[in-house]
Amino acid sequence: MITMKKVLYLFFSVFAVCCSYSKAQVANEDKHRLIVTTDLGGTDPDDVQSMIHLLLCSNVIDIEGLISSQVWIDDPDKTAKISEVVEQFGEVLPRLNKHAEGYPGLNQLRAIIKQGQPVSNMTGVGSGKDSPGSELIISVVDKKKDQRPVWLAAWGGMNTVAQALWKVKHTRSEKAFKKFISKIRIYDVLGQDDAGAWIAKNFPEIIYIRNREVYGWGPSDQWI
């Protein structure tokens, strides 16, 4: 079990390493835009560790979404688990701000924590199945004043990203859809549902980095 004491310990441990880096700042226009979909809150601690690492690097990345996602089975809303890690980040934020500029404030992070699809796999994608997470993805990519591409990093399942693509595909012209997908980049840690395969097969023009297998786990055929 990941307790808040352990989370704080991890924050301070990684913070100690971060302090050894240069104070050189990254200009806003040079930062990568990022939305993360994550199944944080499950039995494995890996996404908690990844979230801590990400937040400690958030002065050099524009984090624009933290979305609670499904994997291959229906799972309850775990946005509260993401919020717990963000609140613990707030405990070390004053110290981080002494060493580097550019960290997002707590309210900024709180506002971008969203729930993704409530139903797993492609069953959760289609007409009338929009979620706060899929709507956030669309609104972030649509920002007209920011032409930097948006990276979508999937630490869990891909069906919230799939829902965003499904909606734009079915509600806009082909030209507008092409413009939309030209602004996204996807990194899929591992196909943890069938939605990633659906995206890759239906939209091959999307820049999509896919891990199709990892040691000790071979996804089923429909996932790859």
Set out the residue ranges of the language-model regions:
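N-terminal acidic, glycine/proline-rich low-complexity segments
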Residues: 25-224
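Bacterial Sec-dependent N-terminal signal peptides
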Residues: 1-26
